[in-house]
């Protein structure tokens, strides 16, 4: 047995499914998950000594690549001053200043420890601010594992095939209205059915938890208009897209102004950080200035703030997003060319530093129904054959891939060559 197999066997006796987050167990593709020893730049190294070109990037945070020296040094320096204080620090203020400068729609920001905390807290704030209970989310979109959001969710919940997770009371779920991504008519119908009861819409501006599905041109502006018409707040969940699709996020890329924004992943530079923020009048409703309660023992942790501050300063440098787009576009075009040569039906969606691979005869993939019609079994075979070639893709047909600026054009071309060999045998 390999070291990964031995570790997985031991882990399953101690951790549910052998992992601390379900998708890591390779549930969506089968087989034994890789146990990682270290990572550097664009590469992962498993405990058996094999190297992989990495397109998971810790599920999004590693936009600069693994083990970036600026982030590593910031963490070391911060750790020498102490690990946690439970009191305000200068770095929290500097981090808040930087985030609100980079994302102009955020007048104020509250730091938390995860994307789930960010979305959960933003929804509570929207409900408290509006005095309404119902929310709108979209099929196949994942916003963390809070009870009200595990309704027709994406990500690992989609892999498990559960429309709702057991343990979510029906009394909670009834306040979550699920509409179809990229379908404004379904959203209007929900508002017209409950015109005075909907507190907010929460949306991934690029749906990255049913693989990678960008919005149609009219979709996000249409959501903004409907929220204005019916007095609801628009929450844009940029946990995945923030600082990746564009420096100011997908909201800037697509030209839409939310009331609240949720951030995560890149904002922590690899440390556990989330954040939510937006309009000053809405944020003023948050404790301690307002009645909507939210708190966290480790929120604003000095190590995490130092890592995030270093990461965002690097991400804000000129050329970063142009490089991400160039590399991702080359990968997408190369995969399509290789698939066409082999006669393999394929769609590759991409925006900024995100991409999605779909085995389908359809000309495009634009919604949940399109995603669910794709050939998941073929993706499973593709995943394992690419893994054998030394390419680590997301181990699920429903998860986006992530590029970093540490990837070289040689890495991209090697990935395309590997895919060409795989398509020929697939």
Curated annotation (Swiss-Prot):
Keywords: Cytoplasm, Isomerase, Porphyrin biosynthesis, Pyridoxal phosphate. Gene3D superfamilies: Aspartate Aminotransferase, domain 1 (3.90.1150.10), Type I PLP-dependent aspartate aminotransferase-like (Major domain) (3.40.640.10). Pfam families: Aminotran_3. It is found in: Cytoplasm. GO terms for biological process: protoporphyrinogen IX biosynthetic process. The modification N6-(pyridoxal phosphate)lysine is found at residue 265. One of its GO terms (molecular function) is pyridoxal phosphate binding. It catalyses: (S)-4-amino-5-oxopentanoate = 5-aminolevulinate. It is an enzyme of class 5 (isomerase). The keyword Cytoplasm applies. GO terms for cellular component: cytoplasm. Homodimer. HAMAP family: HemL_aminotrans_3. Belongs to the class-III pyridoxal-phosphate-dependent aminotransferase family. HemL subfamily. This is Glutamate-1-semialdehyde 2,1-aminomutase. It comes from Shigella boydii serotype 4 (strain Sb227).
